[in-house]
Amino acid sequence: MAEDLINSFMTGPDEQGRFGIFGGRFVSETLMPLILDLEAEYERAKDDASFWAEMDDLWKHYVGRPSPLYFAPRLTEELGGAKIYLKREELNHTGSHKINNVLGQILLARRMGKTRIIAETGAGQHGVATATVCARFGLKCIVYMGAHDVERQAPNVFRMRLLGAEVVPVTSGRGTLKDAMNDALRDWVTNVRDTFYCIGTVAGPHPYPAMVRDFQCIIGRETRRQLAEQEGEGRLPDSVVAAIGGGSNAMGLFHPFLDEPSVRIIGVEAGGKGVDERMQHCASLTGGRPGVLHGNRTYLLQDGEGQILEGHSISAGLDYPGIGPEHAWLKEQGRAEYVSVTDDEALAAFQTLCRLEGIIPALEPSHALAHVVKIAPDLPRDHIMVVNLSGRGDKDIFTVAKHLGVDIRT
C-alpha cells in the first residue's frame, strides 16, 4: 500500500518544487529570478509571526472566517445514507474560497514592493477576489480572462470593473482559462520590475502550488476543528469531497487529512459531455497523461503529439486542461481517488441543493455534489462526508437558465 512506502503525504514538495516526478519550475530565463525571489520571500514570510498575524486578522475581520461547517439535513434525508456536511466557503467575502489565497499573495507582493498585480481567471471568482484585495490595498489590478468566459460570467466581469480592475478579454485559443493564463505569463515576462503574478490555483511553477495550498489549508484545518465540536472530540470525517479544476479548493480541504488513513479523499473532475475519445471534458487525471504546461509537470489533456487540447466544461472554473501537480502525485501514490461527473449531472445536483437546502451553489462545487448524490445512498448512516462548497452560484444563473431552456434576460 502507498501508506507503507511514505512516512507522510504532507512533506512535499522537495527543494526543487517536485512532488515525485510532478511539479518543478519550467520557466524562461527572464522569469527564473522572479520565481526565486518569490520563493525566498515566501520562506521568510512563513517564519514571520507578524505575517501570519496580519493574515489571521484579515481572514477574521475582512473575509469573515471561519466559514461554517453546515450539516445538510434535508439532503442527507433525501439521499438516505451518509451524513453530509457542507464547508460553506461560498459565504466568504467575494463568494468563494479564492480570497483565502489572494490575501496571502497580495501581502507577499507588498513585502516585495510590487505595485501592479496581474491575475488569470476562469469563472471570475479569482479575478473578483484579486480585484477586491487590490482595492483594499490601493494596488493596480489587471485580470486576464478568456473571451468565452467573459461572456458566460458577465456578473463577475462587472464586479471586477466596479472594483477598479482592468479586465482583458483573451481571444486566443478557445478563450478560456488556459489562454488567460498564457497571456498573464506573457505580461509578467515583459513587466518584471513592478508586477506580481497572483496565480489562483495550485498549479504553475514552484513555489505557487505549495504556496497556494498553504494559504488554502485554512479550509481543512477549520473543518477538523468544527467537526470535532459538532460530532465529538477526535471525530474525523470518513470522506472529504471537492471539485477539481486546477485544484486549490480541493487541496485546501484535503491536505490537513492526508496523513489520516481512515479519511477517504475524493476529487471530482469536470466530465463535460463524457470522458471518451471526443475529449469534450476537462478531466485531466481521468482522461489525460503527464506533460508540461504553465511551468509545471502534471497530468494534461493532450493529443498524440503532445499538443494541449482545449477540453470542455459547463463550469468556467473547471475548464482547464491540467491539474495541480500535488494532485497528480496523490493519484500516483493512491492516496486520493479522482472521478468525473458530466455537465448534466452537475446541473441536476445544482438544482437539488437549491431545492433541498435553500443554497445556490456555483457550478464548480455542483460537480462534487453530483458525485455525493451518486455514492452517499450506499454508505452507512454513521458515515460522515464533508463536501467543499467552494463558491456561490449567483454568477452561474444565466448559464444554468440557458441550459434549462429558460430566458431570464427579458
Swiss-Prot record:
Name this polypeptide is given: Tryptophan synthase beta chain
Pfam families: PALP (PF00291)
EC category: lyase
Function according to Swiss-Prot or TrEMBL: The beta subunit is responsible for the synthesis of L-tryptophan from indole and L-serine.
Modified residues (N6-(pyridoxal phosphate)lysine): K98
Catalyzed reaction equations: (1S,2R)-1-C-(indol-3-yl)glycerol 3-phosphate + L-serine = D-glyceraldehyde 3-phosphate + L-tryptophan + H2O
Keyword DNA-binding appears in the UniProt entry: no
GO molecular function annotation: tryptophan synthase activity
Protein keywords: Amino-acid biosynthesis, Aromatic amino acid biosynthesis, Lyase, Pyridoxal phosphate, Tryptophan biosynthesis
